[in-house]
Amino acid sequence: MPDYNYLGQKTAIERYNSLELALQIDSRVINFADNYKNDAKTLSQIIAEKRRFPRDKFELLRKAFPCMICSLRDYAEYIPLEHDLFDIIIIDEASQVSIAQAFPAILRAKKMVVLGDRKQFGNVKTSNASKELNNAYFKRVKEALERDKKIDSSDVTMVRVEKLNISNSILEFMESLSNFEIMLKKHFRGYPEMISFSSRYFYGNYLQAMKVRGKRIEEVLEFVQLEHDDRFDIYKNTNEQEAEKILELVLQQIELEDFRSVAVITPFTEQQTLISNIFTDHERFDEIRKRLKFRSFTFDSCQGEERDIIYYSFVASRNKDRLWAVLPKSMDAQDEEELDRNKKLQRMNVAFSRGKEKLVFVHSKPISEMSAGKEVLNHYKTEIKNAKAMPSVDDVDQNSPAEKRVLEWIKQSKIMKYNPEIQPQFEIGKYLASIDVDYRQPECKKRIPGGGAVWENL
């Protein structure tokens, strides 16, 4: 195998591009500060007073700051209304942005890049908007198009116009207009076992985790099952025992000087509040908050967040179990009583893709008895089982007798008392190819009877 340092090459290219970009941006800012001091003061006052930029002054600002980060509302309130004002406008989390919110940006852009995921949460405000009022306004929009643009109701354009509805996200609308669409398959946040649930149930097993797990599976996935003490919880949808156990585990982490970031995710708002209160009341809360960046979320509020370690508090016990009200009873089949199944599935996808280093599942009821969500826990149980399973001779390259002997030697060695994980046929070439399109697997020379040779990829 040739000497190949992908990370070194990638880092060098990124460093060069970053320096080049910083040089260009810094030179523009310095030029603006040196040659337009009075304009800088005027613009500073305009920004402080939150007034709309004058067209001529905004042109100076655009040249000095070619890259701007702002909210969608800012386009309408401060930036002049003019076509093609920006070369490219990028909208992130587009599934959460309604068409109405995005219009001020669309009108000012030459090109649009829209990033989003329909399998995660959409816009809450538009989903709660009055359908009757929306239909009335939308009818007026279609009538205006038919009248002013002479568009027939059967025209192809009118089919696209149907997507121009406040109840749709800008992601859904742009899908009907875009000339290029691609699925981002590479996952950089967590290990393959951590993202495997979302990849299997939501993305057809297409996600490619870029992090290679170099530690034991127990350090990545952990189950903590509590024997519920039948304690009566004052508030509904709470489990004080789980909250206290999570606090205990976090304090142990602090004692071990493990300062990886931490969050707790739970299906119920009441449990989120209880966990937040228990942590806040503890004497070391300031240390936990600052060192571990601790926060508590519900399945509905964790989108866009990430932490090194995620604790999941499922709340359900033998005495009470309302998981069915928040999570799907089955990932494959819809229950007759489930009216909001799509929202429940989105919760699952969002919540179980927040972790970077470790997922810890804290539950007070046997998985098989849970009213909902059991499939996700069984999935991760299987991931642990598969990782710990000892490979057999059938798992190695059948064309290589030496590999079978090496596997037997490992099984007979002293290292086995440490319960190691053995991964036969680790596809390092496939992994390198997934992170570098220019990578080519090395070739070996294979001799054939009768003389001659043929080159084949390893």
For the regions a language model picked out, list residue spans one by one:
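ASCE P-loop NTPase helicase motor core
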Residues: 47-202
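Conserved helicase/translocase motor-coupling segment
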Residues: 199-280
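Helicase C-terminal subdomain and adjacent C-terminal extension
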Residues: 128-182, 283-284, 322-432, 436
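A short beta-strand element within the Helicase C-terminal
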Residues: 84-90, 305-317, 322-332, 358-360
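Conserved helicase motor
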Residues: 73-77, 269, 295-302
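Conserved helicase NTPase catalytic core signature
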Residues: 1-85
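Conserved motor-coupling elements within RecA-like helicase/translocase cores
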Residues: 58-64, 285-310, 317
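Short beta-strand-loop-alpha-helix junction that forms the active-site gateway
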Residues: 434-458
